[in-house]
Amino acid sequence: MVDIFTSEFTVGESITTDPIPESDFIPNSGNLFPKFPDQIRKTAVEVWLFDAIAEDGSSAITISFFRDALAAPAGFRIAVNASWSDGTIWGKPLIFPKSLITSKGPDVGSGAVTGVWRTDEDSSSHATFEVAADLSTAKVTFDVPGKVVGTLELKSLGFHPLPRSAREAEAAPSIYWMRSIAKAAATVDMVFTSPSADGESTTERPLVIGKDENPAFGGVDRSWESVGWTQAVTDSVFLRAKSGPYDLHFMLLVGKAEQDYRLTASASLYRDGELVCAPHDVLHHTEDGITTGAAAATTTTTRGDVDTLVVKKLFEGEGLPAPFRHQNVGYQLEYTSGGPDGKTWVFETRHQRAWYRKPTGPGTGSSGFIVSVTGGEAGKGKSFQGWGYEGQVVLPE
């Protein structure tokens, strides 16, 4: 039996200041249907993220469909950021007053999900995403004349598992981040339109990724929270990368000092498609190089108990400085698997090409980079190289 579940938002009616309970987390599901299906509180955020990057780092795109109040009363936004090998970038929000999401399947956690961000009923300007019920494929389509038209298609390479519990999906208290499709082969065929410098004309530029002899990878991420980051978080770092046989993913949120919560991450490391490390606990490097357990007064995690991740900002050597408070040139990541036979893998990312830069205040904002990635298993003497993309968000402390 196939049921149809529908969540339809109109910007003037669907955002409220009242508390709105979120729907339950669904184990072993992509959790793609909205957690706030009827209305969303002004402080809450839901997002569906799709991305692709050429394996040689030459070009990339990220697309994020949002349901939140940031663009209200104009509408609900889609953040689109594209990067070409010559350093050209295209980054603009697309804003639509309506958002419709449907799930077709035996239950709300197992259906094929379609999202449509659109203008009025009779308008052809819209953007859609579609994710198969078995999470095998995803497709994003833009039909926004004068801005962007074309498609991003993803075919899953089977890099699961999905979270078995809400805690496994928590990147921070009550902030959820998961990879509905963790790794996919990607193809992009889009055309972007930009105004000329004098504003008298426009230019069009195609973005083609993952075709011919230049393969590409990407994925689908899903996040939601009832309280926005600005109230609880000072920093975040996102990475999707490939280095030889390794695929690296992580999302790290650092809370404000008064939150005093145990530092966690949504992270995974694969070798040849096999999950070898899935840290949820983070052992944090402070900026003076001292290794501590985050929220040391309450954490009991030690190396060897569980999979862990150490994240250290790099300030010396190759790389472009991040534009906001930290000005780091990359990161060192240390994945350690738990148990008596635990192994450690160490990787370095370096900012090679600036992507987007969006200031929000003194020393704060969001930025993105195409990054080189180097590393492998510690003590093995063999290092692998690859590429990925990294996003940083810096918020007031």
Swiss-Prot record:
EC primary class: isomerase
EC code(s) of this entry: 5.5.1.-
Source superkingdom: Eukaryota
Residues annotated as transmembrane: none
Record key words, sorted: Isomerase
Pathway the protein contributes to: Secondary metabolite biosynthesis
Any one Gene Ontology molecular-function term assigned to this protein's record: isomerase activity
Keyword Zinc in record: no
UniProt keyword Isomerase, yes or no: yes
InterPro entries hit by this protein: DA_C
Catalysed reaction, written as an equation: (2S)-3-[(2S)-3,5-dioxo-4-[(2E,4R,6R,8E,10E,12E)-4,6,12-trimethyltetradeca-2,8,10,12-tetraenoyl]pyrrolidin-2-yl]-2-hydroxy-2-methylpropanoate = sch 210972; (2R)-3-[(2S)-3,5-dioxo-4-[(2E,4R,6R,8E,10E,12E)-4,6,12-trimethyltetradeca-2,8,10,12-tetraenoyl]pyrrolidin-2-yl]-2-hydroxy-2-methylpropanoate = sch 210971
Free-text function comment from the UniProt entry: Diels-Alderase; part of the gene cluster that mediates the biosynthesis of the tetramic acids Sch210971 and Sch210972, potential anti-HIV fungal natural product that contain a decalin core. The PKS module of tasS together with the enoylreductase tasC catalyze the formation of the polyketide unit which is then conjugated to 4-hydroxyl-4-methyl glutamate (HMG) by the condensation domain of the tasS NRPS module.
Entry's family note: Belongs to the Diels-Alderase family.
Protein name in UniProt: Diels-Alderase tas3
Organism: Hapsidospora irregularis
